[in-house]
Amino acid sequence: MLTPPPDLKITRLPHNKSVEDMLAEGEVDALIHSDIIKPMEAGDPRVARLWPDYKAEEIRFYKKTQIFPIMHVMGIRQEIVDRHPWIPINLFHAFEKSKAIGMRRMENPRIVPLAWYLEAWNEQQEILGPDPWEYGLGDKNKHNMNTIAGYSHEQGLTKHRWTTDDLFTSTFQGRKRGDEWRI
């Protein structure tokens, strides 16, 4: 259970409201979201990005910190791993194989209906490398996770400064950047 620092106020989201609507209504000041939220899609003038040229800001941040935010983390209860130690690495390989199939498809410029898709794809690879959302605990993800864990500790969200070795099983070494997509 999280025990927040005394100066941090946590309020539960009402069941009858979305955080997107609350932002548009001015009930919350800011929102971090992985999707483009409905008020932005609708062109609601009450909602705007923090940085108008967000792409340039994200690129600047990446070049400065080498952090590209992790989208998801997979967790398996320790009791499951203890009983079935083959599960983590086999799940990892299954997800890697699935991703490899998808990424191979992305190399085809006709996979998405965008006129300049290939140019955007190549630009992303030039800046972020071949796989910005790599799986496993390679050097990039360890750097990301250790940095985030450090921020959590500095901001009083955790009492201990955790590392990836504390939080994750050692079976996930991951694919190295630049490796070919394998199927």
Task: State what each model feature region is.
Residues 4-107:
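Pocket-lining segment of extracytoplasmic ligand-binding domains
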Residues 16, 28-33, 94, 127-136, ...:
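Intrinsic disorder and flexible coil segments
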Residues 18, 44, 55, 113-115, ...:
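Serine/threonine-rich low-complexity intrinsically disordered regions
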Residues 49, 67, 79-80, 127, ...:
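Residue-level preference for alpha-helix termini and adjacent loops
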Residues 49, 117, 121, 177-179:
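Alpha-helix boundary/capping detector
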Residues 75, 80-154:
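Secondary-structure end/capping motifs
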Residues 137-183:
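Long, low-complexity C-terminal extensions of enzymes
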